[in-house]
Amino acid sequence: MKPVLPDYSKAGVLIVGDVMLDRYWYGPTGRISPEAPVPVVKVEQSEERPGGAANVAMNIASLGGHAHIIGLTGQDEPANVLANKLTSLKVHCDFVALPDYPTITKLRVLSRGQQLIRLDFEDKFENTDAQLILSRMESALPKVRAVILSDYAKGALEHVQQFIQKAKAAGVPVFIDPKGSDFERYRGASLLTPNMSEFEAVVGKVKSEQELVEKGFALIEKFDLGALLVTRSEHGMTLLRRGLEPFHLPTQAKEVYDVTGAGDTVISVLAASVAAGKALDEACALANAAAGVVVGKLGTSTVSTIELAEAVHGSKDTDYGVISEDALIEAVKKAQARGEKVVMTNGCFDILHAGHVSYLNHAAELGDRLIVAVNTDESVKRLKGPGRPVNSTDRRMAVLAGLGAVDWVVPFSEDTPQRLIAAVLPNLLVKGGDYKPEDIAGGKEVIAAGGEVKVLNFEEGCSTTEIIEAIKGGRG
């Protein structure tokens, strides 16, 4: 059975660890330097992304979760860039700025998709006062349901045992992405997520599945761990828990471009899923699906709920369900090439009712494929006012995707879907209500491309607003 995505807006996660800024310079290489036998890169584009523990926080935020991050930085420009980028993503930053250290920064120079060199600007944080982080943890722990300790061996987790005990005393599970071969320092953690090389550095070479399981359980006992998740690259993942059978997950990656940040994605999706109420095995299945997405991207990357839903339930390959705009455009082209008539409609669909279902069934009967474009939460709020939507974008899309009449569900953030419709160009655009075809957003573009626009009637007596008022009034 495929796992169901939880409501990540309920997931509060505290991240403590080594924060860093990843910088990228891109450009073509057309000649060799006369000064040394190295290529000359003409830098045409630059990019800055939060990395390390900060990338974990970004992953939590991209899922719609509430991320609170504690880390060590310098008092410098990269620290400001890092804080501004995270804050813009609604990550709560609680950095300890130390004057004698630089903020860890990694600069990568790339040309034609290939990394030519990486330059590191860093000094390991040493002999820091544990209380600087412990006091911040104490304030944050009552607001979260999971803690991630993200260790890149840069010094932020110098006092990691104290951090583990602080979280455990508060009754909050601790998930750790380990670094190095000294797992004694992680004693008592709820879950460790070593990759295969990190695992073998501690237990020795593993020659079989049985040996992996035996050595994994021995590790759990030795270091008093709650569970162990070994990420195994092309062999997927193996989850080991006390008193339970091993849980193996095959890899879901189709193409691997870059493994940078994949471990961050695994632990962030896993912890956020547990914080949102998922059992550990389901959370691991979701993390495995997310890893399959992120290794297909270049550089440190995040996974959105749309991409995660696609990976879990299918869209590009299975050709149905929640889908991204780019994937939808591709799917529509393929469908139209097969001679299928594609119908498209849009709306908020905040509380799905009988009128919506009747309308969508009617729309589906007019063609071979039905697309439903859904206003995002911010778009609904602008259109409907405070208190709306009642249901989040992900929930509304999940319900629509479950209807037999609907083939694809795609979000849009603007007030109208005109841009999206112009990009998709369905054969038939339909809209419910009292409209003139020429006044429907996207209608002119569809007609200009040879398509049609049609207005359908809504079922009388069905209204989301009336349902909300009835609930407020206590009527059934």
Swiss-Prot record:
Transmembrane region(s): none
Entry EC number(s): 2.7.1.167, 2.7.7.70
Active site: 264
GO terms under cellular component: cytosol
EC class name: transferase
UniProt keyword terms in alphabetical order: ATP-binding, Carbohydrate metabolism, Kinase, Multifunctional enzyme, Nucleotide-binding, Nucleotidyltransferase, Transferase
Gene Ontology annotations of biological process type: ADP-L-glycero-beta-D-manno-heptose biosynthetic process
A Pfam family recorded for this sequence: CTP_transf_like
SUPFAM superfamilies referenced in this protein's UniProt entry, alphabetically: Nucleotidylyl transferase, Ribokinase-like
Region (Cytidylyltransferase): 344-476
Renumbered residue ranges of the record's region Ribokinase: 1-318
Biological pathway: Nucleotide-sugar biosynthesis; ADP-L-glycero-beta-D-manno-heptose biosynthesis; ADP-L-glycero-beta-D-manno-heptose from D-glycero-beta-D-manno-heptose 7-phosphate: step 1/4; Nucleotide-sugar biosynthesis; ADP-L-glycero-beta-D-manno-heptose biosynthesis; ADP-L-glycero-beta-D-manno-heptose from D-glycero-beta-D-manno-heptose 7-phosphate: step 3/4
Residues reported to bind ATP: 195-198
A GO molecular-function descriptor: phosphotransferase activity, alcohol group as acceptor
Reactions that this protein is recorded to catalyse: D-glycero-beta-D-manno-heptose 7-phosphate + ATP = D-glycero-beta-D-manno-heptose 1,7-bisphosphate + ADP + H(+); D-glycero-beta-D-manno-heptose 1-phosphate + ATP + H(+) = ADP-D-glycero-beta-D-manno-heptose + diphosphate
Presence of keyword Transferase: yes
Record text on subunit structure and interactions: Homodimer.
Family indicated by similarity: In the N-terminal section; belongs to the carbohydrate kinase PfkB family.
Functional summary from the UniProt entry: Catalyzes the ADP transfer from ATP to D-glycero-beta-D-manno-heptose 1-phosphate, yielding ADP-D-glycero-beta-D-manno-heptose.
Protein name: Bifunctional protein HldE
Organism: Vibrio cholerae serotype O1 (strain M66-2)
Organism lineage string: Bacteria, Pseudomonadati, Pseudomonadota, Gammaproteobacteria, Vibrionales
